[in-house]
Amino acid sequence: MTILNSFPSIFVPLVGLVFPAMAMASLFLYLEKNKIL
């Protein structure tokens, strides 16, 4: 828990938004590749 407290409050929402965004983008590109093929 000390590790979570040492991070700034911005770190959690940043990861919460960036990680899903990257996952959605990679999934979108994967589906687009399959459509082209």
Curated annotation (Swiss-Prot):
One of its GO terms (cellular component) is photosystem I. Its main location: plastid. One of its GO terms (biological process) is photosynthesis. It is found in: Plastid, Chloroplast thylakoid membrane. Keywords: Chloroplast, Membrane, Photosynthesis, Photosystem I, Plastid, Thylakoid, Transmembrane, Transmembrane helix. The chain crosses the membrane at residues 10-30. The keyword Membrane applies. It holds the Pfam family PSI_8. It is a single-pass membrane protein. Belongs to the PsaI family. May help in the organization of the PsaL subunit. This is Photosystem I reaction center subunit VIII.
